[in-house]
Amino acid sequence: MAHTKKGGSSRNGRDSESKRLGVKKFGGEAVLAGNIIVRQRGTKWHPGANVGLGKDHTIFATVNGSVSFRTKANGRTYVSVNPIAEAAE
């Protein structure tokens, strides 16, 4: 009796959703307080002056200013925000 054999079952076709990690604001860019600068797993970049570190290691600005990245002698890269001088009104 003619019939079609059972089709194969693929064991592929799964992947995790991307987490959109990485640098969101680059060196020299202006940021506002609360802006996310880096999303990361672990501390590839370390917090410097005027930034905070979230519980998921996200680095964010605590003041308005411009972003700067600096590698120190210990080999660690630190992210800081240089505050903008407020104009006196």
Curated annotation (Swiss-Prot):
The UniProt record lists the keyword Ribosomal protein: yes
Keywords from the named record: Ribonucleoprotein, Ribosomal protein
SUPFAM superfamilies documented for this protein: Ribosomal L27 protein-like
Example of a GO biological process term: translation
Listed Gene3D superfamilies: 2.40.50.100
One Gene Ontology cellular component: cytosolic large ribosomal subunit
Gene transcribed to yield this protein: rpmA
GO MF assignments: structural constituent of ribosome
UniProt region (Disordered), positions on chain: 1-22
Name of the protein: Large ribosomal subunit protein bL27
Ribosomal protein listed as a keyword: yes
InterPro entries per the UniProt record, alphabetical: Ribosomal_bL27, Ribosomal_bL27_CS
Family to which the UniProt record says this protein belongs: Belongs to the bacterial ribosomal protein bL27 family.
Pfam families: Ribosomal_L27 (PF01016)
